[in-house]
């Protein structure tokens, strides 16, 4: 056997052994390759010079302006979650839809779509939905299978509905892979693939899934008109509560996503405005003083975005030094004022645990994501040190079916990896390896990215190892057995596979909107 192939097998076994051993994934992904590389180097089979690129990789991750959007979107979602927006929206939407079983179930799907779009974190969304909606669903007479499956499936919508953290990370890696692929093909000035392209490409498939879920719920619960507690409200009261509780969150998501899709703001800028808006929504339920101070903060954020577009905001340099021009002075002054307003928001909040809890969880989640990104970079370097990229290229190109044979095998591998790895590890390990090879063909990078997102979502929902099932198990009562959870998600897995097959068969579902908006 080729020595490189032997060491690649050892590398794969070491990484999976580390992951399955129970040590933190971060240590397994970084430590196992390092150990294998040191052993191989002692046998003269690996050049330790590859590790000289690690500091550059780390610096590149930390200075990537696109990845700066990740902690901002995480904070936006956590602010909405901690301020109990989901519970308020669920109650008012159920009442507005009629207050019966089907209304409650439909409300769960629609509210999940909104919350998933704002958080993009499967674990947080499913735990929140399980805590809030499961008792209400069971109390309304909806059986435990429908209730469990609905929560698990709805909680995974954050994988595909923009603005999604999965799509942001995919955008970074797909962009790099596409650029590398085009350079290999002799195109040294390819059109860039942006996160906005992926957001636009994932919008229709995401809405398709919401439509499939709502259709399934309606067909199964139609005619079951047992009333829930919310029907005591009058139609007028229901509508006013609906507008009061849903309009702010929906408006925030539309503003954030719309500003990216029409090219007014970058994902990072839009995420910053989203945090300001989420702060206002969170403060609105905690007293008038907090609301007005947070509103001033949000207004300043929007004003800064307008000034940025007009060229009146931003640091300018001359001769390697900061030039104290009007845009520079505006930027410095805005940072000072914005910092003062944020401090005022903290002081004005009667219940500061909302903001404090959101900030602390943001630090933990962001640290985990960036730690895994850096660890995956180390794994990638060791993999390339054993010429793994060349061996993968030879394997994929030898498959029958050409580009679509490569795509099918890649999707199968990603689906199986979804049982044991989180989306961050999969994106930063698999895409850099197979992306440059697959994207040298005529496969659209946007379509490829959307298929990966849908595939990950399906994998996380599929028994017996889907992550969504374990998250739900942690909040489900003892009366709902693990077997019940497995059975409950099977219809939704079928809907997921149908959506995945439809997008695979009709690429225009993923490519039409980006072409209309950006070309």
Describe these PLM feature segments.
Residues 1-519:
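Alpha-helical transmembrane segments of multi-pass membrane transport proteins
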């Amino acid at each position: 056997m080729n020595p490189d192939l032997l060491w690649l097998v050892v590398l794969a076994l070491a990484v999976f052994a580390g992951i399955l051993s129970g040590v933190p994934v971060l240590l397994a992904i970084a430590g196992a390759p390092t150990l294998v590389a040191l052993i191989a180097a002692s046998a003269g089979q690996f050049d330790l010079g590859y590790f000289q690129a690690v500091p550059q990789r780390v610096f590149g991750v930390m200075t990537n302006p696109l990845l700066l959007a990740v902690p901002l979107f995480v904070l936006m979602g956590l602010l909405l979650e901690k301020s109990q927006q989901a519970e308020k929206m669920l109650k008012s939407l159920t009442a507005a839809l009629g207050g019966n079983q089907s209304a409650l179930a439909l409300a769960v799907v629609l509210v999940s779509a909104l919350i998933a779009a704002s958080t993009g974190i499967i674990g947080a969304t499913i735990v929140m939905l399980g805590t809030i909606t499961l008792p209400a669903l069971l109390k309304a007479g909806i059986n435990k299978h429908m209730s469990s499956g609905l929560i698990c499936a709805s909680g995974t919508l954050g994988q595909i509905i923009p603005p999604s953290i999965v799509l942001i990370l995919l955008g970074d890696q797909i962009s790099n892979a596409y650029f590398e692929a085009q350079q290999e093909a002799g195109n040294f000035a390819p059109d860039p693939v942006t996160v906005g392209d992926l957001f636009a490409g994932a919008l229709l498939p995401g809405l398709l899934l919401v439509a499939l879920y709502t259709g399934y719920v309606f067909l199964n619960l139609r005619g079951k008109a047992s009333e829930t507690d919310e029907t005591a409200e009058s139609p007028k009261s229901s509508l006013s509560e609906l507008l009061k509780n849903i309009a702010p969150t929906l408006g925030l998501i539309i503003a954030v996503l719309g500003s990216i899709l029409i090219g007014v703001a970058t994902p990072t800028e839009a995420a910053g405005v989203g945090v300001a808006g989420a702060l206002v929504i969170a403060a609105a339920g905690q007293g008038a003083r907090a609301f007005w101070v947070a509103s001033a903060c949000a207004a300043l954020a929007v004003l800064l975005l307008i000034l940025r577009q007009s060229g009146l905001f931003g640091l300018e340099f001359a001769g390697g030094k900061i030039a104290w021009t009007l845009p520079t002075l505006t930027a410095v002054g805005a940072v000072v004022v914005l910092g003062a307003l944020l401090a005022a928001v903290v002081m004005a909040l009667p219940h500061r645990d909302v903001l404090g809890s959101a900030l602390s969880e943001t630090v933990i989640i962001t640290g985990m994501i960036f730690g895994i990104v850096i660890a995956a970079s180390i794994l990638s370097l060791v993999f390339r040190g054993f010429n793994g990229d060349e061996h993968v290229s030879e394997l994929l190109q030898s498959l029958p079916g050409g580009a679509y044979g490569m795509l099918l095998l890649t999707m199968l591998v990603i689906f199986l990896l979804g049982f044991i790895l989180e989306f961050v590890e999969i994106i930063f390990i698999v895409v850099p390896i197979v992306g440059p090879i697959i994207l040298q063909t005529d496969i659209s990078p946007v379509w490829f990215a959307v298929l990966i997102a849908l595939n990950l979502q399906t994998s996380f929902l599929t028994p017996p190892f889907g992550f969504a099932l374990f998250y739900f198990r942690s909040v489900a009562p003892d009366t709902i057995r693990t077997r019940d959870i497995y059975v409950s998600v099977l219809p939704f897995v079928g809907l997921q596979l149908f959506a995945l097959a439809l997008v695979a068969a009709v690429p225009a579902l993923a490519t039409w909107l980006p072409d209309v908006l950006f070309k």
